[in-house]
Amino acid sequence: MDSTDTRLLQALARNARASVSDLARSLDLARSTVQTRLEKLERDGTIAGYSLRLGEHAAAARIRATVLLQISPRAAPALLSRLRATPEVERAHSSSGRFDLILQLAAETTTALDETLDRIGAFDGVTRSESLIHLATKIDRAI
């Protein structure tokens, strides 16, 4: 990936709905160059898809939390399967240190978040959890 690919990805991060022609114009590249690079980035998995990113107002309507989980050594496969089936779980990361998994949750209400936390805490293999409620997003550079 070179600087042109990086610029292309940054342009898509700003507006994933931009047409190939608009991208080419804004990056001062030929339309065919942009099309070829997009196809390559999709083929090699750099671009995994195009998705909706909620605006601040819509995102603020959901309550988010980071949940740190300690789990039993052999519990990960079954636990991850249960977490995948839990719609409030947006992300799950394995980690080093005291906690084995870091989850990001989102719920419509504090009651729904509380119920989700209780459900996850009761899953087989969870030995300890710690929840951190997000109050405000100060920096968001996610692409």
Give the positions of each predicted feature.
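A compositional/biophysical signature of low hydrophobicity enriched in polar/charged and small residues
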Residues: 1-143
